[in-house]
Amino acid sequence: MIWNSKTLSAALGITISNSINCNEVQFNSKDVKKGDLFIALQGNRDGHDYVLDAIDKGAAAVIISKQVEINDKDKIILVDDCFEALQKMALYKRENSKAKFIVITGSVGKTSTKEALKVLLQHDFLVFASRGNFNNKLGMLINLASMADDTEYAIFELGMNHKGEIRELVQILKPNIAMITNISEAHLEFFNSLEEIAEAKCEIFANFSKNDIAVINADTNCYNKILSILKNLSITDIHSFGRSSKTSAELILYENLGEQVYLKYKINNKVLDVTIPFIPRHFTENYTGVLLIIDILGKDIEIAANHLANISPTKGRGEIINIQNCRVICDYYNASPQSMKAALEYLKQVPAENKTAIIGDMLELGENSKRLHEKLVQYILDAACSKVYLVGVNTKYIDDLLPSKIAKKYFKNVDELMTHITDLFEGNELILIKGSRGVKLDKIVDYYK
């Protein structure tokens, strides 16, 4: 059990006399499982309207701030403010946890890096990793409040699209190790430059103590800017990873063997050789940082490297599925210029006679949108696509520049594309689906489920 009457009373500063034992904390009644704790938050909808639904699904208790007619009164925990109660629960978990906290941020690669680190650690330790990419303030609080007391390693990812957001979150999380995967043009709509994005990402170090450790991708944009910020914060325990021999951890070789890839890493002068099922290069570059963290923790990196084969892309983040006799690379969860380039390079790497790209808008790029979408044209050509489907207002910039030798179609939105859904998959093709989440390209895959 994650919560009981005693710990809830201590966290919330109230007396709970009835016997309560709960598992994970949920704010969406659709996610409630038997034994969970439902908290009625006020958002676009009032969580109090879904309390009965949560109880029907097996919630062991409900936290509410106004009266709701419930038959089993022993399940009720009444507070003044539900969101404040959630914050108190999260703070209680952090203050009473003996776990080492590893927190990851970056423009792209946060979730895949977090999941890889989880896989490599969970064979030998009790690991908690934040769910999915739920990486804003609410997500962090819900995840932290759902962490088991015996957790040895807690892994969180933090996202942001405005200055100050990460600073607020690390005041609660207090990371022992903080990692920046990279800095790229994601969220440029809300910033004036890459340097401003780097400054916002570096807020992950704002709550560091003298024993905390920074892990940085040396190949990223603004690397020297990050080092300057760390120096100003008097942070000296800095470890880098990347493609350079000057880093603490280096990806020496990535060799495509068809259905497998051969990888050679050097982690603090220890050379590792590993062959794993085929995965794009950009994933294996982030694994360099993951192996570096394993080494920093004093764990056996040779054993950890052998577990790399157990990592597979998560839903919507590069997984390959079969639809209508076509292999489909599902990478529709989000898109930035860097991740779009990586996805098209992935398409280029995978051997196939016929390749199709379904490209959706990259959102939140502001006045840079036209330039950054036009930049994708060369990557599409390099991937040798025979067909290209473009979805969204901004992809019109791509449509205008693609040569006529490529069979192409432009759609204003995914709903317009869906009227032609049966024409998309002709069989024996390799198809990439890539775009920002707001474009909703997942509808294409959901149609065939």
From Swiss-Prot:
Cystine connections: none
A GO biological process held by the record: peptidoglycan biosynthetic process
A GO CC term assigned to this protein in UniProt: cytoplasm
Pathway per the UniProt entry: Cell wall biogenesis; peptidoglycan biosynthesis
Pfam families linked: Mur_ligase, Mur_ligase_C, Mur_ligase_M
EC top class named in words: ligase
SUPFAM superfamilies tied to this protein: MurD-like peptide ligases, catalytic domain, MurD-like peptide ligases, peptide-binding domain, MurE/MurF N-terminal domain
Domain of life: Bacteria
Catalytic activity: D-alanyl-D-alanine + UDP-N-acetyl-alpha-D-muramoyl-L-alanyl-gamma-D-glutamyl-meso-2,6-diaminopimelate + ATP = UDP-N-acetyl-alpha-D-muramoyl-L-alanyl-gamma-D-glutamyl-meso-2,6-diaminopimeloyl-D-alanyl-D-alanine + ADP + phosphate + H(+)
Subcellular location(s) per record: Cytoplasm
InterPro entries to which the protein is assigned, alphabetical: Mur-like_cat_sf (IPR036565), Mur_ligase_C (IPR004101), Mur_ligase_C_dom_sf (IPR036615), Mur_ligase_cen (IPR013221), Mur_ligase_N (IPR000713), MurCDEF_CellWall_CoF430Synth (IPR051046), MurE/MurF_N (IPR035911), UDP-N-AcMur_synth (IPR005863)
Residues where ATP binds: G106, S107, V108, G109, K110, T111, S112
The protein's Enzyme Commission number: 6.3.2.10
GO MF annotation terms: ATP binding; UDP-N-acetylmuramoyl-tripeptide-D-alanyl-D-alanine ligase activity; UDP-N-acetylmuramoylalanyl-D-glutamyl-2,6-diaminopimelate-D-alanyl-D-alanine ligase activity
Keywords from the UniProt entry: ATP-binding, Cell cycle, Cell division, Cell shape, Cell wall biogenesis/degradation, Cytoplasm, Ligase, Nucleotide-binding, Peptidoglycan synthesis
Record family assignment: Belongs to the MurCDEF family. MurF subfamily.
Role noted for this protein: Involved in cell wall formation. Catalyzes the final step in the synthesis of UDP-N-acetylmuramoyl-pentapeptide, the precursor of murein.
Name by which UniProt lists this protein: UDP-N-acetylmuramoyl-tripeptide--D-alanyl-D-alanine ligase
Protein source organism: Rickettsia montanensis
